[in-house]
Amino acid sequence: MESLTILTDRRYTYEDYLKLDDDRDYEIIGGKLIVVPRPRPRHQKIVSRLVTVLEGYLRQNRAGELYLDVDVLFGDQVVSPDLVIILKDRLSIVQETNISGAPDLVVEVLSPSTAKYDRKEKSQLYYAGGVQEYWLVDPSLQLVEVFVRGEKDWNRSGIYDESETLFSPLLPGLEIELKDIFME
């Protein structure tokens, strides 16, 4: 299993990030350069199924746009969430090469090597940056935790297992049958 590597030899910036020219995936949080392992097939299958459902919802409701594997900038910090949604009234944050500011919804599919990072550092960055809703999808436990912004931190709005239907406070009327997302 690949692991997450954090480089702390100096403070990294988005300018440094743009100069990286190998095939690895990187993120920068708090000036630290993080080498993120590539997603595995099961991870990608779950993301693909979520995209299908969410794209249908967004198109039908003309609610916004969905982006995958895109650089999201919070100042000099850059991350590439598995999936983000920008609601239609905030599409101005979408630039030619990145998203400059907080998406409305961020979805991270956990892997053993990134779970702690997604739950702590990225979660804190998303909250501080202004993300409205954050989903943590756990393929091994077959559940999704949905968090919404509280006054000082995230509030868990729901925890849904593979036998349940996920509801999103941010996307009225959205219902996701998780058995369809987690099926083998």
What positions do the PLM features span?
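Gly/Pro/Ser/Thr-rich low-complexity, intrinsically disordered segments predominantly at protein N-termini
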Residues: M1-E184
